[in-house]
Curated annotation (Swiss-Prot):
Phenotype of gene-disrupted mutants: Inviable.
Transmembrane segments: 53-73
Major localization class: Golgi
Lumenal side: 22-52
Annotated keywords: Endoplasmic reticulum, Golgi apparatus, Membrane, Signal, Transmembrane, Transmembrane helix
Species, as recorded: Schizosaccharomyces pombe (strain 972 / ATCC 24843) (Fission yeast)
Protein name: Protein kish
Amino acid sequence: MTAIFNFESLLFVILLTICTCTYLHRQFPALLEKRKEGVTMVFWKCARIGERASPYISLFCVFMALRFIFGSS
């Protein structure tokens, strides 16, 4: 089943996108700063969400990791 139709997988993909964009913005600030328009604006917004909601994103990462390790089937 694709990540679009499975809610848990969709949340996992969104979380990974936020974490990746935040990491890239920390390592290469100019990479996302000049791309605030168009389709790439989504990645800039994900980086902002990751920076501003960092404790909540971290807790959600831990929760999803435990859920992935121990399974929920």
